[in-house]
Amino acid sequence: MISQLTVFIENKKGHLANACRAIANAGINMHALFLADTADFGIARIFCDRPNFATQALRDAGFRAKITPVLAVRIPDHKGCLADLLEFLDSEDVNIEYGYCYSANNGYAIDVLKVSGDEVEERLTLAGYQLVAPNEIYELD
């Protein structure tokens, strides 16, 4: 598992920009951002380097932030590869709570998934999927 930053942001003009600025001012690079919203607040899920420092920077700026463990799976950046991964997880009775993807610009995509199930990492590895190690994405802080 790797660390993802989860941030609760009031659904008001400028608040997302303020959160991103707090991260940038701490010298932290964001790799991916996924937003979900309700009427009153949004949830930003951020894949970044130095997630522990980012969490503290956001808390210092007045945001509610926490680290969430997620899977990161490297798959070829070709049509059908994401569907193959999701079908495999379904066949293994793994529930996917949410996910997002980004292109790694090297012929691969990184699929970030919040899952529930037993020994998911081991099952993915045995099936030939490449899990992304934390030190491939961010500095271990």
Short names for language-model regions:
Residues 1-141:
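A conserved regulatory-domain signal marking ACT and ACT-like small-molecule sensing domains
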